[in-house]
Amino acid sequence: MEVNILAFIAIVLFISVPTAFLLIIYVKTVSESN
């Protein structure tokens, strides 16, 4: 169970961090466009 939980956390971080980074860039681009 512990390994599965750690793997789940690692996957969530691996997906959420780049997504948040791209989202921030997108918001900045839209703000500059407007």
From Swiss-Prot:
GO terms for cellular component: chloroplast thylakoid membrane; photosystem II. GO terms for biological process: photosynthesis, light reaction. Its main location: plastid. The chain crosses the membrane at residues 5-25. InterPro entries: PSII_PsbM, PSII_PsbM_sf. Pfam families: PsbM. Keywords: Chloroplast, Membrane, Photosynthesis, Photosystem II, Plastid, Reaction center, Thylakoid, Transmembrane, Transmembrane helix. It is a single-pass membrane protein. PSII is composed of 1 copy each of membrane proteins PsbA, PsbB, PsbC, PsbD, PsbE, PsbF, PsbH, PsbI, PsbJ, PsbK, PsbL, PsbM, PsbT, PsbX, PsbY, PsbZ, Psb30/Ycf12, at least 3 peripheral proteins of the oxygen-evolving complex and a large number of cofactors. It forms dimeric complexes. HAMAP family: PSII_PsbM (MF_00438). NCBIfam families: PS_II_psbM. One of the components of the core complex of photosystem II (PSII). PSII is a light-driven water:plastoquinone oxidoreductase that uses light energy to abstract electrons from H(2)O, generating O(2) and a proton gradient subsequently used for ATP formation. It consists of a core antenna complex that captures photons, and an electron transfer chain that converts photonic excitation into a charge separation. This subunit is found at the monomer-monomer interface. Belongs to the PsbM family. This is Photosystem II reaction center protein M. It comes from Cycas taitungensis. The gene is psbM.
